[in-house]
Regions:
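Catalytic nucleophile-loop/oxyanion-hole region of alpha/beta-hydrolase
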Residues: 61-72
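Conserved alpha/beta-hydrolase "nucleophile elbow" surrounding the catalytic nucleophile
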Residues: 26-28, 87, 91-96
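Flexible "cap/lid" loop of the alpha/beta hydrolase fold
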Residues: 97-105, 109-141
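Conserved acidic catalytic loop of the alpha/beta-hydrolase fold
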Residues: 70-87
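Conserved HGGG/HGGXW glycine-rich cap/lid loop of the alpha/beta-hydrolase fold
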Residues: 9-60
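Residue in the alpha/beta-hydrolase core beta-strand immediately N-terminal to the catalytic nucleophile
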Residues: 52, 88, 111-114
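N-terminal cap/lid segment of alpha/beta-hydrolase-fold proteins
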Residues: 1-10
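Conserved alpha/beta-hydrolase catalytic His-Asp/Glu region
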Residues: 123-190
Length: 191
């Protein structure tokens, strides 16, 4: 388990490979473990980092850290703590929303982004994310596919308040507008 301490709080991450830094950001019910197969493939060419966002996996769980702004600050502080100057980002769901916000606020720190499965508006957010209990969300999002046991165990570490806080913050955002304001090369798959 790799950690860095930011403002006295533990941030958990895992890293594989050598090369240019590539950050993987997980979805609403997940952690770094979600990305293992992709990290293994990417680590041939890149230094692949998978970070547990505030409230997920083994990263600290404090409700005041769960806003999208705090998640963006986590990435910036993480890069500074590790001495990383520029990254590429791959994000899914919540990770895509955090990644998009990070790129718009810090275009000089990101050379490209691949963002998938993020809603362009609140009407595109599945109501289950707001209302379903965590075990139901884990089953829905991870399915029953073989090989999901480790990811399922990690997903159960999610603080449901972290999911709700990010969804509440999204109500004030126009993600389509943010996407249009990006100057960093972007490949996106939206809902």
């Amino acid at each position: 388990m790799s950690i860095v301490t930011l403002d006295g709080e533990i941030i958990h991450y895992e890293v594989l490979g050598r090369g240019r830094p590539l950050f993987f950001l997980h979805g609403w019910v997940g952690s770094w473990r979600y990305w293992i197969p992709t990290m293994q493939a990417a680590s041939i060419t890149y230094r692949a980092y998978a970070i547990d966002l505030w409230g997920f996996g083994d990263t600290a769980k404090r409700a005041e850290r769960y806003t999208l702004d705090q998640q963006v600050k986590l990435l910036d502080s993480f890069m500074e703590a590790l001495g990383i100057a520029k990254i590429a980002i791959v994000g899914h769901g919540l990770g895509a929303v955090v990644g998009l916000n990070f790129v718009v606020k810090n275009p000089q720190l990101v050379d490209r982004a691949l963002l998938t499965g993020f809603p362009l508006g609140n009407s595109a957010v599945n109501a289950r994310l707001r209302s379903a209990p965590l075990p139901e969300l884990v089953d829905w999002l991870l399915g029953k596919a073989p090989g999901t046991d480790a990811a399922r165990a990690e997903a159960n570490k999610t603080d449901p308040q972290a999911v709700r806080a990010s969804l509440n913050d999204m109500e004030a955002l126009n993600l389509l507008d943010l996407t249009m304001r990006m100057t960093t090369p972007l490949k996106a798959s939206c809902q």
